[in-house]
Design a protein with these regions (language model features):
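Substrate-binding rim/cap in mid-to-C-terminal beta-strand-loop elements of soluble/periplasmic
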Residues: 52-69, 168, 219-274
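Hydrophobic, well-ordered secondary-structure elements that form the walls
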Residues: 83, 208, 264
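Polar, surface-exposed loop/tail segments
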Residues: 102, 247-266, 270-321
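A long, amphipathic alpha-helix that forms part
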Residues: 136-157, 161-217, 223-227, 231-235, ...
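Active-site-proximal alpha/beta segments of enzymes that process anionic O-linked groups
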Residues: 2-176, 296
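Short amphipathic alpha-helical face segments that pack within enzyme cores
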Residues: 19, 78, 180-187, 263-267
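Intrinsically disordered, low-complexity regions enriched in proline, serine, glycine
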Residues: 12-14, 33, 92-93, 201, ...
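Histidine-centered active-site microenvironments of extracellular/periplasmic hydrolases
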Residues: 105-113, 194-200, 205-246, 285-308
């Protein structure tokens, strides 16, 4: 399950999504005397402090996250295709029209059809970039998306399934509008958790880059840092079975390792293929697979000493923090 909010830094999420962050935090370990203690036996959550964007705009990051390559490579295959090929029921919800999404981000990719799809396409309602509540039928736009996502997750509770909920609530210059979605996201996650509908599920809450829209923040060091460090939080179910022990150890260590969208892409592939993932060939320009040669699954060991932003040809290395 992917919860994607465009243009949200980790710091902004902590400020404006306080209830949602508390949901993730209650599954994080803490020091209890000489040992680590875990609040919940079957769930564990992680936050990634050094998750770094490639560019300060979506087209420079989105294809890497979900296609495993840059927009310069033509006919990219969306990760969803591999999910469908492996029997997953797929769902996609967005507050941006498919036509606009295709024009802006996906003109270099192959189109993909989901089993279920919901789009809010009224331009009088979406008002992307505007620092106001974006409402439809008396509720914030995101309410309808997350409600549809909940219906999907409930209907297919006994099936292998994938859901991507994509919103632009962080895509405005005041950094305030995002807070109106906090209750919506929190209630969505809490409801599924209380009904035990997150079992055998990994939740990835992610953004492609931090806040970048024109505002007074452009003049501050605050902008320079947050714009390059988007949020990434992961909730894993069934912690005790991570072969789990090595995988758990690695993802815990990787919270403090320099990572990118390539690692996010490979993590989805690892979740999909499990132990077979290590035998999958790397993606090349002629050969498309769910594994990028430029990244590693967050459940695997990543040597921090070999992570250098200068090794990525398409990264603005001067912005690294």
């Amino acid at each position: 399950m992917i919860l994607y909010i465009d243009s949200v830094s980790r710091a902004l999420a902590l400020r404006q999504l306080k209830k949602t962050m508390k949901f993730f935090e209650k599954f994080m370990p803490y020091h209890g005397g000489h040992h680590m203690k875990y609040p919940e036996e079957n769930y564990h959550s992680f936050q990634f402090f050094k998750y770094h964007s490639f560019r300060m705009f979506t087209p420079g990051n989105f294809p890497i996250l979900f296609y495993g390559n840059t927009k310069e490579v033509k006919d990219l295959v969306l990760m969803t295709r591999y999910l469908k090929e492996n029997g997953y029921v797929t769902n996609y919800c967005s507050d941006e029209c498919k036509k606009d999404n295709t024009r802006t981000h996906h003109n270099m990719t192959q189109s993909e059809i989901y089993d279920h799809q919901m789009l809010l396409c009224d331009p009088n309602v979406v008002l992307m970039n505007k620092p106001i509540k974006k409402c439809l039928y008396g509720n914030i736009n995101s309410y309808h998306l997350y409600n549809y996502g909940k219906q999907f997750w409930t209907k297919y509770k006994d099936n292998r399934k994938f859901s991507a909920l994509v919103t632009n609530d962080g895509h405005e210059s005041t950094l305030e509008a995002l807070k109106y979605t906090d209750d919506i996201i929190y209630n969505y996650l809490t409801s599924l958790y209380d009904q035990n509908l997150l079992k055998d599920t990994t939740v990835l809450m992610v953004s492609d880059h931090g806040t970048v829209l024109p505002s007074i923040y452009f003049l501050s060091d605050f902008f320079q840092k947050e714009g390059r460090l988007p949020m990434l939080f992961i909730l894993v179910n069934d912690r005790k079975n991570m072969s789990y022990y090595d995988q758990y150890y690695h993802i815990q260590k990787n919270q403090q390792t320099f990572i990118t969208g390539y690692d996010f892409y490979n993590t989805i592939g690892h979740l999909l293929y499990g132990d077979k993932y290590k035998d999958i060939e790397n993606k090349t320009n002629e050969h498309d697979t769910p594994k990028s040669p430029f990244g590693e699954s967050l459940f695997n060991y990543i040597n921090p000493m070999k992570r250098n932003p200068k090794n990525y040809q398409n990264m603005d290395t001067h912005i690294c923090k």
